[in-house]
Amino acid sequence: MACSGCSCEAAVGAMASEAYLEGAPVREARELVAELCRHFYAQGWVTGTGGSITVKVNDPTVPLADRLIVMSPSGVQKERMVAEDMYVMAADGKVLSAPVAKPWPNKPPKCTDCAPLFMKAYLMRGAGAVIHSHGIETCIATMLIPGAKEFRVTHMEMIKGIKGHGYHDELVIPIIENTPYEYELTDSLSEAIAAYPKATAVLVRNHGIYVWGESWINAKTQAECYHYLLDACIKLYQLGIDWTTPEHGSINNPRRPHSILSPEICNGCHAADSSKCVVLDIEGTTTPISFVTDVMFPYARDNVRKHLTSTFDFEETKEDIKLLRIQIEDDLQNGVAGAVPVPPDEGGKEEVINSLVANVESMIKADRKITSLKQLQGHIWRIGFQKKELQGVVFEDVPVALKNWHASGIKVYIYSSGSREAQRLLFGNTTYGDLRKFLCGYFDTTTGNKRETRSYFEISQSLGVDSPSQILFITDVFQEAIAAKNAGFEVIISIRPGNAPLPDNHGFRTIKSFSEI
């Protein structure tokens, strides 16, 4: 926990002292960054003086958020880096120690142009180290799907090396557009970090990648995994293999006209036949509303206290609580009914949990579609599915349709207000078995509000279609249908038992079963 008041000022002053700056922790951090620069140069990540590395000083007596920062300089040959070349900064980015100028032809010392971006990763993610690589694979990978806002890959072993991911998961890396100057990327990087709470990296189109971790070892390991995966995807592209689907089928297979790189489209009279991709809502579309309202929501509500109590000190739950605190603070400022203040951690575990439970119960009762709630619910449901206390329910026509679309080469995605993890849990544990093999990806509220047109525009960019009209969206919610239609999607409204009535003359095609498509 960060220090405060006079004690904080004293601590900062002590760390800014010459004795501390020349002490073992700072010296070791300087040497580490120099060593990593030389190592990454050999990997081809920081050639031509490009790329950069930063780490927090490893001093266990100081909270991570308050530790000093060591950054590599700009314009220096990375393979010749030494500890004396490094900049040392306070936790707020203030330079405390700068390198001494070297004779010509060396350039005057200058801190890395990545500094403001590194600071965002430190402040927004609580990182312990950040790596910026110009590895050629990080540049080429963003060119494979022009205009895409995300890079997606699934079912590859090295995905397990990325925090919070497993072999079966879909790894999603946000892509931001390059700018003439590095510092101009700061806002778009911040937006990507905020929009993708699970991400530990951001790609910059035609440029490189930023990777962060809780320690230099974690950041380095993940960076190696990202480079491996991106390089593998480029090679798969050259071989005509689709890396975005579980089965990794052929990109140019005539039975797979939907492929992310294939321009051909099937000709046919049915909606799915004229689409490269199908995007499905869950509640009221693939799954009865009653299952969500009568089974899933009550399970999360009834187990939230138990979950928070038993996992309070877990990193995953700490992140959940952090997101809830941010949402609750915003709710309090906006006068949202049911929002109650959450005491600081010093107030005691029980008091914090009591207030969180009250807020979560209020959020569930109001059926709020917010990321902080959906992420926590997903973690609670995960335990329920693991214990076999929950089993996913889908309408009987859904597995048949998914199988047929899959066999026809049509990619199917899910877009739900539930977290991506919750989506995978539901479809991976249904009464019809594991249906995830028929699904190519998952979108949730990190993409955007389901009733906003821009969310569907983002999805169309991510799927790499030539036109949004090549995407069929099926939902039970009229407002979502309007938003998707305004984004150029083809839209069908699902009529299922328990769904809300539609307005007269709504203008959309409706179905009562996927067999009608």
Curated annotation (Swiss-Prot):
Transcription as UniProt keyword: no
Residue positions binding Zn(2+): H132, H134, H207
EC number: 4.2.1.109, 3.1.3.77
Disulphide-bonded residues: none
Catalysed reaction equations from the record: 5-(methylsulfanyl)-D-ribulose 1-phosphate = 5-methylsulfanyl-2,3-dioxopentyl phosphate + H2O; 5-methylsulfanyl-2,3-dioxopentyl phosphate + H2O = 1,2-dihydroxy-5-(methylsulfanyl)pent-1-en-3-one + phosphate
Cofactor note: Binds 1 zinc ion per subunit.
Annotated Mg(2+) binding sites: D281, E283, D476
Region named Methylthioribulose-1-phosphate dehydratase: 1-242
Gene Ontology cellular component list: cytoplasm
TM annotation in the entry: none
GO biological process assignments: L-methionine salvage from methylthioadenosine
Cofactor(s) the protein needs: Zn(2+); Mg(2+)
Residues reported in the UniProt entry to bind substrate 2: S416, S417, K450
InterPro entries, per database record: Aldolase_II/adducin_N, Aldolase_II/adducin_N_sf, Enolase-ppase_E1, HAD-like_sf, HAD-SF_hydro_IA, HAD_sf, MethylthioRu-1-P_deHdtase_MtnB, MtnB_viridiplantae
Single GO term (MF): magnesium ion binding
Keywords associated with the record: Amino-acid biosynthesis, Hydrolase, Lyase, Magnesium, Metal-binding, Methionine biosynthesis, Multifunctional enzyme, Zinc
Binding residues annotated for substrate 1, in chain numbering: C114
Record: active site: E157
Region (Enolase-phosphatase E1): 278-517
PANTHER family: ENOLASE-PHOSPHATASE E1
Family note: In the N-terminal section; belongs to the aldolase class II family. MtnB subfamily.
Protein name, entry field: Probable bifunctional methylthioribulose-1-phosphate dehydratase/enolase-phosphatase E1
Organism: Zea mays
Upper classification of the organism: Eukaryota, Viridiplantae, Streptophyta, Embryophyta, Tracheophyta
